[in-house]
């Protein structure tokens, strides 16, 4: 019995793999991609937040509509980890670079969690809201 569609199925699988192939990023590739950029992220298609990547592995993060938080990032155990001034608890992520930008997977104590997707990349600085004034 001859399977005439087998080569087509193999080709379709190869094309699907190449379209969805992502490269896991180490600290050096992450730094090259992000430094001097502001990235906007979404989770499950919903706007999530923005982060500006500054020289020296410094960052400014803001959930949409929230105040900016200053922080730093570093590599630990092949993960990209962040610590912010307002929240000193380490937050580690796996970052993958694909044709449509970055995908970030939160790597908490319970295993992989939240996935964020880059939806915009700009060299414009992050616009931070001022803290509440007066009481």
Predicted feature residues:
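Bacterial N-terminal signal peptides
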Residues: 7-16
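Positively charged n-region of N-terminal signal peptides that target proteins for export
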Residues: 1-4
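Lipid interaction determinants
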Residues: 17-70, 79-135
């Amino acid at each position: 019995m001859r399977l005439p569609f087998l080569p087509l199925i193999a080709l379709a699988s190869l094309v699907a793999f190449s379209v969805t192939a992502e490269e896991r990023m180490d600290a050096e590739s992450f730094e090259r991609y992000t430094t001097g950029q502001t990235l906007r992220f979404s989770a499950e298609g919903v706007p999530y937040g923005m982060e500006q990547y500054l020289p020296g592995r410094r960052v400014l993060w803001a959930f949409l509509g929230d105040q900016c938080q200053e922080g730093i990032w570093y590599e630990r155990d092949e993960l990209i980890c962040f610590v912010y001034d307002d929240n000193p608890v380490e937050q580690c992520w796996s970052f993958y670079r694909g044709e449509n930008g970055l995908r970030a997977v939160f790597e908490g104590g319970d295993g992989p969690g939240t996935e964020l997707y880059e939806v915009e990349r700009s060299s414009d600085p992050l616009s931070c809201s001022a803290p509440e004034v007066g009481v």
